A protein has these predicted regions:
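Membrane-interfacial amphipathic/re-entrant helices at transmembrane-helix boundaries
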Residues: 1-20, 48, 59-63, 89-93, ...
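Helix-loop-helix "hairpin" substructures at the membrane interface of multi-pass membrane proteins
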Residues: 13, 135-215, 239-244
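Short, non-helical or kinked segments that cap or interrupt transmembrane helices
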Residues: 15, 24-46, 60, 88-93, ...
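Transmembrane alpha-helical segments in multi-pass inner-membrane proteins
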Residues: 57-69, 194-201, 207, 211-271
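Hydrophobic core segments of alpha-helical transmembrane domains in multi-pass membrane transport
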Residues: 46-51, 67-74, 101-109, 148-157, ...
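Transmembrane helix-bundle core of multi-pass membrane transporters
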Residues: 86-162, 189, 255, 260, ...
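Membrane-embedded helix boundary and interhelical linker motif in transport proteins
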Residues: 8, 30-77, 81, 86, ...
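Alpha-helical transmembrane segments within multi-pass membrane transporters and channels
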Residues: 24, 57-101, 108, 244-249, ...
């Protein structure tokens, strides 16, 4: 039962990484930039949810919606103030700005909520499930996380392929200048992309802290890095790739902790990424990019 339990835990953790990675892959796929402050938006969403449930005593559903609203507005604000002026700047300028935004959010959280860890309450509306006379426990958080991941991936896929705004996003992703000539508002499209990615980060933050109920200002840092790794692993810019990469990364991490070493699990995860990129630089489901000369 240990193997099955580890597999379930890996899929659950990987589903969180997948939801975060979807935010990365959407922003990169459409705006062609990497938002390394994405992990800290996760932290903000978790803190908002914590305040709603702990201080206002409102239901978890209200807390999740509030976290999504705040993070959506935060994502639009970050894009407008930090990234929009750098649209034509080099990638190094964007990277430095993203790191600066990340540290800014962490320090603001430190000023508001302090450095003491906060205990996060579970958002699950039902109890864990015990199977085989209690030998296998499937937590309610795991079930909710996996279901949420599947729903989000399907919804995003349908949105990008069927909706008018989704088609506009794909057009901007292919060629910004051509999309603008066709009447698409590129600025609004990119802002909407950041908004969606930040809303997903809020959901991921709540799910992550519900499963691992300790909340500090740096909560989103490592999950953010691992989710970026998952996005690259699966093929950054690909929605199914983000989900596949996240789940595989979660499984590798949990099995590494269980069968090899807890202290080496992160190193193993990143080593696997390096091997995959050496064999397939675009990731598992990434498309090969060709340039015409």
């Amino acid at each position: 039962m240990t193997f099955i339990s580890n597999l379930i835990n890996g899929i659950s953790l990987g589903s969180v990484y997948a939801i975060i990675a979807l935010g990365y892959t959407m922003v990169y796929g459409i705006a062609k930039m990497l938002n390394f402050a994405h992990g800290d938006v996760i932290m903000v969403g978790a803190y908002i949810s914590f305040c709603i449930t702990t201080y206002l005593k409102l239901p978890p559903v209200v807390a999740i919606v509030a976290a999504m609203v705040v993070c959506t507005l935060l994502g639009i604000l970050i894009e407008g103030m930090a990234y929009k002026p750098l649209r034509k700047a080099g990638s190094l300028a964007v990277l430095i700005t993203a790191i600066g935004v990340s540290y800014f959010l962490q320090n603001v959280a430190l000023l508001i909520w302090g450095s003491a860890p906060k205990t996060f309450s579970s958002v699950a509306p039902f109890n864990s499930i015990a199977l085989f006379n209690g030998q296998l426990i499937i937590t309610a958080e795991s079930i909710i996380t996996v279901i949420a991941c599947i729903i989000i991936m399907i919804a995003l896929t349908l949105f990008t392929k069927k909706s008018k705004m989704g088609k506009a996003m794909r057009a901007v992703s292919e060629d910004k200048d051509a999309a603008e000539l066709m009447g698409i508002n590129v600025n609004v499209t990119i802002s909407l992309t950041f908004a969606i990615g930040s809303a997903l980060a809020a959901i991921a933050g709540v799910l992550l802290c519900s499963a691992y109920p300790v909340l500090v200002p740096t909560t989103g840092s490592m999950p953010g890095i691992k989710a970026f790794t998952a996005a690259v692993f699966g093929g950054i810019g690909s929605i199914p790739g983000a989900m596949l990469g996240g789940i595989l990364l979660g499984i590798i991490e949990i099995f590494s902790k269980s069968y090899i070493s807890t202290s080496l699990s992160d190193a193993i995860v990143f080593a696997v990424l390096i091997i995959v990129l050496l064999v397939r630089p675009t990731g598992i489901l990434g498309k090969k990019i060709t340039e015409k000369v």
